[in-house]
A protein has these predicted regions:
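Solvent-exposed, conformationally flexible loop/turn segments
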Residues: 8, 20-23, 85-90
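Short, small-residue-biased leader/transition segments that mark boundaries at the very start
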Residues: 1-3
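Intrinsically disordered, low-complexity Pro/Gly/Ser/Thr-rich segments with frequent PxxP/GP/PP motifs
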Residues: 62-103
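Local beta-strand/beta-hairpin segments that build beta-sheet-rich folds
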Residues: 9-16, 25-32, 67-83
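Beta-hairpin (beta-strand-turn-beta-strand) motif
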Residues: 95-96, 111-113, 121-125
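Beta-rich globular "head" domains
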Residues: 24-59, 115-123
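Short acidic, glycine-rich loop/turn motifs
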Residues: 58-63, 110
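Noncatalytic modules at the cell exterior or secretory-pathway interfaces
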Residues: 40, 98-115
Length: 126
């Protein structure tokens, strides 16, 4: 199947107050089977009365690509220990795009439980 024959679906994923417990990342998105996802944007808002520290991770175990790129992916930080002031928002990707493969996970953690809200925009290619 040629990529131009595949369906592109735009989606928005929102979360109101996460993670439930500081130190336990909240899974924002998991790529479905037979799907490639392009992250178009991620905006995170601090809903707390003081600054919080945020981490955004891409967790991937994709492997078996063949050729010179036949290595297993791991966890990559898209944001690490980023301070967001009280009542402020941060655009994590700021114009960049990230490709996610089947079973990849995007997750967020915060220094204080239930104090970040956000919107994730993606395009799924199926």
């Amino acid at each position: 199947m040629c990529i131009r024959d595949r369906a592109n679906t735009f989606k928005t994923v929102t979360f109101a107050a996460e993670p439930a417990s500081a130190g336990t990342p909240y899974v924002m998105y998991t790529v479905a089977g037979s799907t490639t996802t392009v992250i178009l944007g991620l905006r995170v808002t601090n809903i707390h009365t003081t600054s919080v520290t945020v981490e955004v991770e891409l967790v991937s175990d994709t492997a078996n690509r063949g050729g010179n790129n036949n290595v297993t992916n791991g966890t990559a930080f898209l944001a690490k220990d980023v301070v967001i002031p009280a009542k402020s928002s941060l655009e994590i990707l700021a114009g960049s795009k990230i490709v996610m493969e089947t079973t990849d996970v995007l997750q967020i953690d915060c220094s204080v439980a239930d104090k970040v809200s956000g919107t994730l925009s993606v395009m799924e290619i199926t």
